[in-house]
Amino acid sequence: MQKVLVVGASGHIGRYAALAFKKRGWFVRVLVRDPEKLKRPGPFGEPLLEGVVDEIVTGDAAKPDTLFGIADGIDTVFSSMGLRSSKPGMSYHDIDYLGNANILQEVMLHDVQKFIYVSIFKADEMMEMQIVKAHEDFVQALKDSGIDYSILRPNAYFSDMLQFQKMATSGVIIWPGDGSLRINPIHGEDMGDICVDTAAPGHQEIDIGGPDIFTYKEMFTLAFTTIDKEPRIIFIPLWIVKGLHSFIKPLNARIADMLAFAIAVNEIDNTAPRYGERHMKDFFETFGGKNRTD
């Protein structure tokens, strides 16, 4: 039986990856800081993992002394671990790079055959952002390590799009640019299946999107219609957002990074190769009740 260690198993993709490996007959060990989180489903329908996976190990990737033996007997390591947003006293560099580097250092002490890592789509076009640089610093460390690897680059997840439905609930969506650029996000469960597929031998870097392509304007309209609201969308010219970014950058690095990301995704085509069978409209309709105000 093949054995996998899933790092970041309390997160959105980590949960789906752990479940997908288990369904394919793998022995699944998960590493988490707080095992209590695995006793309940995630906020976007992600599966609970207690009683599903074979072994739950408690450890903190930022503390190497808690990681001893985590990869003992493991064939493949999967990591989607990373900060969703920067926090006081903790940076993207600390977790997305150093945390994963600590995992890799421990992994190299064992006979692990493969390391699968979830990075960022079109990262080379957004390297000025802290979160992107941290991801790609680890990608380079992984490539330099000599271990077989797969680098997965999803463009976005369905759960990311719920922010637009929440905005729609307030009555208006405000967005940089003109809404003409395109994106095809993927459901976390479809992404989990791809994670298992890429455990096959051989170096791989894969761009990943979902089956349905939308312009941002079409995505916003769908966010409104699935909660029975009339679309109201305000687009802000990019030159205004860029000016705001230049003003904010020396004052607040976190907000500046958020603005930089908003600018970046409105200057590149975010469509990726199509995978999966689940659809954005169905996901919006499932969560629409939670975002509806009558």
Q: What are these regions, as identified by a protein language model?
A:
Residues 3-27, 31-32:
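N-terminal Rossmann NAD(P)H-binding glycine-rich loop of SDR-like oxidoreductase domains
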Residues 5, 36-102, 106-109, 124:
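NAD(P)H-binding glycine-rich loop region in Rossmannoid oxidoreductase-like domains
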Residues 83-169:
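Glycine-/Pro-rich loop/turn segments that contact NAD(P) or position catalytic residues
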Residues 99, 177-198, 204:
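Substrate-positioning beta->alpha
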Residues 159-166, 197-206, 229-231:
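Glycine/proline-rich active-site loop of Rossmann-fold NAD(P)-dependent oxidoreductases
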Residues 180-189, 208-226, 239-243, 278:
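Substrate-binding strand-loop-helix patch
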